[in-house]
């Protein structure tokens, strides 16, 4: 029985090491690159003394951020993602709430850490992702891991003014991904188009099945969601066939006549949520891509 989400990555590395796992317009990481960088980060965090504690990941949305998440898990810790799109006060409250001693940053965020008042150890991704991995250390950490260990804490929007952390743990994530994948029919040929920020739990629908099946996830630029035609062209350019989006993003495409200009050529699986899908817009989607399945 699988007890650790890292098994998804390790099993896939054995099968398709050089296949693209995560990509955006600027960079891409293969499964072996995700594995190697994550293990290096895990080794560095362990050397720094991190274990069974939160590690904040303060990076822009990119493939390397996802590798950092799994580096934190390799260290036996749990990741807490924050993003420069968040209001500064929100990030400060998250840091106060977690009382984290470690933070991973990249070039885009390094000059913004001081403003958050973080007083712990800040590690640059560019350096710790190149640390020589120590398999002996990582094996020892794994031997002490349990399926009830936390792997992330993601914070809600904070309707009361104070963000609240939601904990994900190995067993819960594994059970969810196994069930979701069975229903939606993911496989090695799945190409996801990610919409949501990496600090929201909605991105789990793409990140973990990608590792499980050796699929591919494209991180779609936020700017695309302002221009429906450009968005559909992005889907076509990268042969994206599966999306798990909020209804408002789907409506933005259908309601503005986008299908008169361009239609999604490869989409066959569309999972939607967050609100009711208006019948008129839903029918437009169904008529445009009649062979697609909607969930």
Name these PLM-found stretches.
Residues 59-63, 77-93, 107-109, 215-238, ...:
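ATP-dependent adenylate-forming carboxylate-activation enzymes
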């Amino acid at each position: 029985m699988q007890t650790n989400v890292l098994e998804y990555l390790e099993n896939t590395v054995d099968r398709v090491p050089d296949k693209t796992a995560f990509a955006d317009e600027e960079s891409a990481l293969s499964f072996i690159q995700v594995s190697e960088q994550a293990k290096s980060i895990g080794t560095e965090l362990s050397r720094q003394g991190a274990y069974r504690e939160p590690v904040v990941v303060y990076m822009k949305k990119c493939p390397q951020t996802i590798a950092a998440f799994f580096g934190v898990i390799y260290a036996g810790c749990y990741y807490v993602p924050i993003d420069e799109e968040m209001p500064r006060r929100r990030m400060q409250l998250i840091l106060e709430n977690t009382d984290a001693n470690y933070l991973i940053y990249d070039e885009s965020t390094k000059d913004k850490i001081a403003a958050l008042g973080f007083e712990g150890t800040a590690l640059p991704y560019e350096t710790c992702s190149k640390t020589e991995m120590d398999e002996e250390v990582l094996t020892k950490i794994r031997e002490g891991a349990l399926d009830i260990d936390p792997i992330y804490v993601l914070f809600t929007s904070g309707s009361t003014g104070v963000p609240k952390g939601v904990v994900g743990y190995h067993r819960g994530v594994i059970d969810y991904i196994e069930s979701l994948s069975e229903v939606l029919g993911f496989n090695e040929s799945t190409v996801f188009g990610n919409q949501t920020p990496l600090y929201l739990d909605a991105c789990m629908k793409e990140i973990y099945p990608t590792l499980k099946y050796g699929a591919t996830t494209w991180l779609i630029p936020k700017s695309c969601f302002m221009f429906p035609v450009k968005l559909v062209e992005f889907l076509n350019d990268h042969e994206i066939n599966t999306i798990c989006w909020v209804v408002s993003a789907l409506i933005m495409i259908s309601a503005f006549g986008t299908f008169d200009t361009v239609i999604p050529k490869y989409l066959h699986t569309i999972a939607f949520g967050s609100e009711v899908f208006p019948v008129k817009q839903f029918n437009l989607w169904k008529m445009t891509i009649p062979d697609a399945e909607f969930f």
